[in-house]
């Protein structure tokens, strides 16, 4: 632990011009920060992500099954409508002289309304699937971010002891004193 503390203290000193030292510019160390964050996200979020995706997949499959049941109901309605259509066609042959155009109009309206119902059910199924996918993606993103943040905070809290904290503060105070002397 003392070696780790000494390495932090030695990294805390401002290097002279042209030498190697700790870079505190967050924009210059962005690649390192990104790799650390990605590593933490992958390490802590892998299991949770797979569980969430499996749960979401099951829900989506259930939604698809429900949509298929609705579709089967619509097909059943379509068959009933076709049976009714056949009946109407038989009656049309009998009453052709009394209103052929009226019966034909009834037939077209029945077919159109059935197809519209089928289209609406298909659109509803597709919208439901898309909505569930988007909601799942958003939930997974939020959960992974929360767990990565909790893991990072836990790691920081477990690594930062009082002794290390005091040494870091003293080293920073020493640096600020040296900077103040240079600027005065």
Swiss-Prot record:
<keyword id="KW-0812">Transmembrane</keyword>
<keyword id="KW-0793">Thylakoid</keyword>
<keyword id="KW-0138">CF(0)</keyword>
<keyword id="KW-0813">Transport</keyword>
<keyword id="KW-0472">Membrane</keyword>
<protein>
    <recommendedName>
        <fullName>ATP synthase subunit b, chloroplastic</fullName>
    </recommendedName>
</protein>
<dbReference type="GO" id="GO:0045259">
    <property type="term" value="C:proton-transporting ATP synthase complex"/>
</dbReference>
<comment type="function">
    <text>F(1)F(0) ATP synthase produces ATP from ADP in the presence of a proton or sodium gradient. F-type ATPases consist of two structural domains, F(1) containing the extramembraneous catalytic core and F(0) containing the membrane proton channel, linked together by a central stalk and a peripheral stalk. During catalysis, ATP synthesis in the catalytic domain of F(1) is coupled via a rotary mechanism of the central stalk subunits to proton translocation.</text>
</comment>
<comment type="similarity">
    <text>Belongs to the ATPase B chain family.</text>
</comment>
<dbReference type="GO" id="GO:0009535">
    <property type="term" value="C:chloroplast thylakoid membrane"/>
</dbReference>
<keyword id="KW-0406">Ion transport</keyword>
<comment type="function">
    <text>Component of the F(0) channel, it forms part of the peripheral stalk, linking F(1) to F(0).</text>
</comment>
<keyword id="KW-0066">ATP synthesis</keyword>
<feature type="transmembrane region" description="Helical">
    <location>
        <begin position="27"/>
        <end position="49"/>
    </location>
</feature>
<keyword id="KW-0934">Plastid</keyword>
<dbReference type="Pfam" id="PF00430">
    <property type="entry name" value="ATP-synt_B"/>
</dbReference>
<comment type="subunit">
    <text>F-type ATPases have 2 components, F(1) - the catalytic core - and F(0) - the membrane proton channel. F(1) has five subunits: alpha(3), beta(3), gamma(1), delta(1), epsilon(1). F(0) has four main subunits: a(1), b(1), b'(1) and c(10-14). The alpha and beta chains form an alternating ring which encloses part of the gamma chain. F(1) is attached to F(0) by a central stalk formed by the gamma and epsilon chains, while a peripheral stalk is formed by the delta, b and b' chains.</text>
</comment>
<keyword id="KW-0375">Hydrogen ion transport</keyword>
<dbReference type="InterPro" id="IPR002146">
    <property type="entry name" value="ATP_synth_b/b'su_bac/chlpt"/>
</dbReference>
<keyword id="KW-1133">Transmembrane helix</keyword>
<keyword id="KW-0150">Chloroplast</keyword>
<dbReference type="GO" id="GO:0046933">
    <property type="term" value="F:proton-transporting ATP synthase activity, rotational mechanism"/>
</dbReference>
């Amino acid at each position: 632990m003392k070696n780790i503390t000494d390495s932090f203290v030695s990294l805390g000193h401002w290097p002279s011009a042209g030498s190697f030292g700790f870079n505190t510019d967050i924009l210059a160390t962005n690649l390192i920060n990104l790799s650390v964050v990605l590593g933490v996200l992958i390490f802590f979020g892998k299991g949770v992500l797979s569980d969430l995706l499996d749960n979401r997949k099951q829900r989506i499959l259930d939604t698809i099954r429900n949509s298929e049941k609705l579709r089967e109901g619509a097909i059943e309605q379509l068959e009933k409508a076709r049976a009714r259509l056949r009946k109407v066609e038989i009656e049309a042959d009998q009453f052709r002289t009394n209103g052929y155009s009226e019966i034909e109009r009834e037939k077209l309206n029945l077919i159109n309304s059935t197809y519209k119902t089928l289209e609406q059910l298909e659109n509803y199924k597709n919208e439901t699937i898309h909505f569930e996918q988007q909601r799942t993606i958003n939930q997974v993103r939020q959960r992974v971010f929360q767990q990565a943040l909790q893991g990072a905070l836990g790691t920081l809290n477990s690594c930062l002891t009082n002794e290390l904290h005091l040494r870091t503060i003293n080293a920073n105070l020493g640096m600020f004193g040296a900077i103040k002397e240079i600027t005065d």
